[in-house]
């Protein structure tokens, strides 16, 4: 888990100005005031969604300004209201006023809505200022300004997917391929000393989806008892939706049996306890750019026997990475729906 933060500036739309106008029609030489009111400025609205689970969008888009209302017109025509801006935030986002520190809202369920900045009221046209003794008023109101705030967004991010496997099987290279994360990568075990989190984006705005992958530091036999980098990293996997288990099928690993490698790590996950043993798994044959065909065949047969999804990739050349990325996105989407139903 890590804390994702973003600071944004929101400005609701100003109200439109009221109009000063008089009725001018044939045979009506002294028409009364007919100035319409200005439209209301657009609000800035936050809405929680399960389609995203990071604040990455707000890091790159810190300024949000709603449309102002249109000015009033003659013939008592009111100006059009400004369009609201809907900002989609992940469930779990906490919103603070950055200047006062006041907690504004904690989005705990999907589809919650909060107006974080109200649009300004439109000004009144001169029709409102007519009286029995003042029948041709020239007064009219300017629109009122929309609210403007600096907000701080905070989100506790949990990885959707944990990438597991022996040290040096290509986990860090994979996460650098499918996300913007830049983990330290080298050809020796335990390069990764802390979990690396990467945000993966699939699709394009406004329909893009994101999910978070955690590159869990290499596990070895006895990890649940603290061997290698210890059981503290297994705790990072505990709250993920899905495991992607990388197995080296090249000769570089120095280990002759990929099925034994898979079973060793699977046993460590099971021995740790909790729900790790029952998590959905995608099996991935890694380093197929220098594949040992016998190893690949053995691993594929094992995955088929266990009815587990199976993919072949080379994170170095990119072969098979896109197919795996979209399979991960589809599985996360399904698991999020299941979780929502259970809740």
UniProtKB/Swiss-Prot annotation:
> Its Gene Ontology molecular function terms?
GTP binding; GTPase activity; magnesium ion binding
Please give the residue ranges the record annotates as the region Disordered.
121-140
Its domain of life reads Bacteria
The entry marks the following residues as binding GTP, namely 165-172, 190-194, 215-218, 286-289, 314-316
Enzyme nomenclature, EC number:
3.6.5.-
Name the Pfam families on file. GTP1_OBG (PF01018), MMR_HSR1 (PF01926)
Q: Which UniProt keywords apply?
A: Cytoplasm, GTP-binding, Hydrolase, Magnesium, Metal-binding, Nucleotide-binding
Asked whether the keyword GTP-binding is assigned, the reply is: yes
Q: Which cysteines are joined by disulfide bonds?
A: none
Q: What is its main location?
A: cytoplasm
Transmembrane region(s): none
Which positions bind Mg(2+)?
A: 172, 192
Q: Where in the cell is it found?
A: Cytoplasm
Quote the NCBIfam families the UniProt record gives.
Answer: Obg_CgtA, PRK12296.1, PRK12297.1, PRK12299.1, small_GTP
Record's function text: An essential GTPase which binds GTP, GDP and possibly (p)ppGpp with moderate affinity, with high nucleotide exchange rates and a fairly low GTP hydrolysis rate. Plays a role in control of the cell cycle, stress response, ribosome biogenesis and in those bacteria that undergo differentiation, in morphogenesis control.
Q: Assembly and interactions?
A: Monomer.
The similarity comment for this entry is: Belongs to the TRAFAC class OBG-HflX-like GTPase superfamily. OBG GTPase family.
Q: What is this protein called?
A: GTPase Obg
